[in-house]
């Protein structure tokens, strides 16, 4: 099962809006829209894992953290993101981190 975190991105929201419009005009079924979203979840996770190679450093003050259901959530204040020549400052950032390994990979490594 792929994580659904990226459905709430600009790309994911645009896809959902387009699918909703197609459902309303009866051009596709809700079941097909769900299949498209599931495929999007798999594809975006695979693409980000294999194609993104840029490195960004960030520093901030940890406000809160939580670990629940194998998911880490961090809230940082006064954060600076640095990439080679760029610097971006933001007041607040929420980071959600999930285990990138599939269950089958974890089970093999646990043995």
Curated annotation (Swiss-Prot):
SUPFAM superfamilies associated with the record: Transcription factor IIA (TFIIA), alpha-helical domain (SSF47396), Transcription factor IIA (TFIIA), beta-barrel domain (SSF50784)
Compartments where located: Nucleus
GO cellular component, one term: transcription factor TFIIA complex
Transmembrane segments: none
Keyword list, A-Z: Nucleus, Transcription, Transcription regulation
Any Pfam family hit: TFIIA_gamma_N
InterPro entries in the cross-refs: TFIIA_a-hlx, TFIIA_b-brl, TFIIA_gsu, TFIIA_gsu_C, TFIIA_gsu_N
Keyword RNA-binding in annotation: no
BP term (GO), one: transcription initiation at RNA polymerase II promoter
Family recorded in the similarity comment: Belongs to the TFIIA subunit 2 family.
Subunit structure, as described in the record: TFIIA is a heterodimer of the large unprocessed subunit 1 and a small subunit gamma. It was originally believed to be a heterotrimer of an alpha, a beta and a gamma subunit. Interacts with NCOA6 general coactivator. TFIIA forms a complex with TBP.
Protein role: TFIIA is a component of the transcription machinery of RNA polymerase II and plays an important role in transcriptional activation. TFIIA in a complex with TBP mediates transcriptional activity.
Listed name of the protein: Transcription initiation factor IIA subunit 2
Source organism (scientific name): Paralichthys olivaceus
Gene name in the database record: gtf2a2
